[in-house]
């Protein structure tokens, strides 16, 4: 809490008591599971209630998997925890703003009658990775997927729950989700697996042809930027809706980053939707200095 340096350096809450919760197990090349996060939050909330103390949870944890509208199970869970006693949850907005991992569009054809095309650049030596497509469940369409070598795969909304295809040297697993009690959005999950050593390098194109459209919007997401290579990204990416989950939960305080040297929002910091000021649940709630921050190091 920054109260041990004889007044020379001081944290933002020097008289706070710290409760440190370690997530997950010691597994090589692994990350904490969502269930482990939920168990850690439950432990912290129960401890605060038992001690009759206020609780501020600092959560610098997030990923890109989900619809990003606050309706997932973990987002709802955080909303419920935030209502217990004197509890506040602060969550970082993530570092996906400039990662090129989000693309969005509508099912409408352009003025020339062409169907929308989303192009994904896959870098050299890319191992397995995934792509999420989120849409309104009531929208029906056909997807044409083109590989870097020009091979074509046509899919429609009547896709089986799970199918497997091979395109060039890439195995493609496609899963079609269903609406949940929390959301009417539907996920189509593409799992790119190398048939030999790596996924085919080059441009993969998703062309979406509308059949019957009511909502009209869709979003593509790649895994967090730490998973694919730096060259794997959408060509026409957008920084909007790049908040990592669970910073999208309604009742948490979402904190982004800005650059104090340029007095601008940090390009890497996750962003929310472009909404009018009168809207509710605008994210992030505020930003704090996040570039070239001075801090302590071991032995200093």
Positions of predicted regions on the chain:
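Loop-rich non-cytosolic ectodomains and luminal regions
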Residues: 1-300
